[in-house]
Amino acid sequence: MRHTALLPLVSSFIVPALAQIPGQTTVNATVNQGRFGNATYDYVIVGGGTSGLAIAARLAEDPSLSVAVIEAGGYYELDGTVASIIPGLAAGANVGTDATEYSTVDWNFQAQPLTSANDRSLRYNRGKTLGGSSARHYMVYQRGTRGSYDQWAELTGDESWGWDSVFPYFQRSVNVTPANMTGRFPNTTVTYDPSGFNKAGGPLHVTWPNYGSPWSTWIEQGLEAIGILPDTDFNTGTLNGSSWAPITINPLSQKRDSSETSFLQQSLKTTNLTVYLHTMALKIGFDGTTASSVDVRSPVGRFTLSARREIIVSAGALQSPQLLMVSGIGPRETLERHGIPVVKELAGVGQKMWEHPFFGITHQVNLVTATELAINQQALLQALNQYKSQQGPLTSAGFGVLGWEKLPNSTLSDSTNEALATFPSDWPTIEYLSIDGYLNGWHSAADQATGNGQQWGTIAVALVAPLSRGNVTISSSDMDDPPVFDLGFLTHPADREIAVAAMRRIRQAFAAISEITIGDEVVPGADVSTDEELLDFIRESIVPVYHVAGTCAMGREDDPEAVVDPQARVIGVNNLRVVDASIFPTLPPGHPQSTCYMVAEKIADLIKKGN
């Protein structure tokens, strides 16, 4: 039985109430809207997403500079549903991986069939809105390990990308508010290291929701029973243990905080930043090998935006390489196949794609989880009433506790250990996620109403040291044609072995909290027991965490696979940078929004200093 009629109820009930919530950002619908027609700016930024709005806002702080942002979408608060705003409805906002799923604030891309996962083709979330994917994800804010960024320094030949050097840029973007324990249960106490943050940081808010789910408290116990200790910190360079996850929400309103509600809204109050809404970047124009303009299409027609100084591409890890390729930068064979004149041959464009896949185990449980909101209208009404006072389960994004573990070498084969040796020693192998509901592949939000009134609890794992790589390419010279991308899940044998080992670890954690489970394991089921059976289940249920990165990788200029240099400048051309997750040399363990902001802060600082 599935209950799918509750979201309209949410909209009709909560929309009038949003205006009453303190700390709400008023949407500035004019956003210093650029006039549709040819224009020239000092900096033209393609993409108003996580990194794009951050770097735009920082550059616009200089009153002598003119800065324009090209964004294909609009405001998610206006174009989307309230599920984009309320953390507890994020699952409904994100929709699922089925091809029939659709969001008005998303590109709704479809990945190529997964050759090592039963040829499943998954719909893939990418924000088509101001804020980009910071308006779409589950808001987790945590940083990678010290070693992961020190490895960036090694790969780029630039020590300024090491942990000690990038740490201040992490701090610059955010301000942290300690958890308000008034509405949280006593056993949901938050522990963190304040030294990870700076009181002068901002404008992005980081805090903890005013609700900690009972399910997550049990996950914390289960993880501790298998050696994953609680009360660790996620933002000072170590990921080893579990804790309540900090998320990017406004501490007063308990609403999502994105690059739009933070960086853009602050910038609109103090600068002359110009934003072109619902405007599609079609092609970068060059004078020889110097980037000079961007051809765009708006609701009223096509025109050209020229840049006196630089064009900065921040279109995300799928569309930044796509835009480079349709503009003449990329693998020669690809460009020539589509009749695109070669401006600069760069074989690495679109290659070395990283992503974190995840899957998990679900049990029926004897406590109330977020499942109740999907199957019980009265419970949802009660939660909505609580949310009007910034309390209750809708302040939380459907999870609470995250955990990290580096699997012992003794549990893995020599070949897998050898493959994992390419990662720094402090890099965890897997991340545990406490999901307050049902998971068996992420088909749609209606998954949460599976069954006949049961309460579900899931422990999921993400492979955060993946060895499989994907790629993205183009099908034509037209940006209107979606990018063609292969996530590459499970193509490396080490990932398959680690995935099976992770499933067995989840079962050990569940065994330690058996007093709250009802009956046998539901997903995948107790009869799925051999390595082969577990791997078959993983192939059929593995889904992305939407952390795609690395497709315009940063590296040394003599690295044949590098696309940008350590200053994010596209190699071999002038006045063109890429600033988003596509330039990550590796994808640090965990959730990348913190690193997207850090990269934007660092490159903005370099530009301001004349580099």
Swiss-Prot record:
UniProt-recorded Gene Ontology molecular function terms: flavin adenine dinucleotide binding; oxidoreductase activity; oxidoreductase activity, acting on CH-OH group of donors
Presence of the UniProt keyword Protein transport in the record: no
Positions annotated to bind FAD: T50, S51, E71, A72, H137, Y138, M139, V140, A581, P592, Q593
Cofactor(s) the protein needs: FAD
Endpoints of the signal sequence: 1-19
Record keywords, A-Z: FAD, Flavoprotein, Glycoprotein, Oxidoreductase, Signal
Residues forming coiled coils: none
Glycosylation sites: N28, N38, N180, N187, N240, N272, N409, N471
Gene deletion effect: Abolishes the production of aspernidine A, but accumulates the intermediate aspernidine E.
Residues the record marks as active site: H547
GO aspect biological process, one term: secondary metabolite biosynthetic process
Record keyword Cell membrane present: no
EC number: 1.1.-.-
InterPro entries per UniProt: FAD/NAD-bd_sf, GMC_OxRdtase, GMC_OxRdtase_N, GMC_OxRtase_C
EC main group: oxidoreductase
Family the UniProt entry places it in: Belongs to the GMC oxidoreductase family.
Functional note: Dehydrogenase; part of the gene cluster that mediates the biosynthesis of aspernidine A, a prenylated isoindolinone. The starting point of the biosynthesis of aspernidin A is the production of orsellinaldehyde by the non-reducing polyketide synthase pkfA. Hydroxylation, methylation of one of the phenol groups, and prenylation, presumably catalyzed by the prenyltransferase pkfE, would be needed to yield aspernidine D. Subsequently, the cytochrome P450 monooxygenase pkfB is responsible for hydroxylation of aspernidine D to yield aspernidine E.
Name under which the protein is recorded: Dehydrogenase pkfF
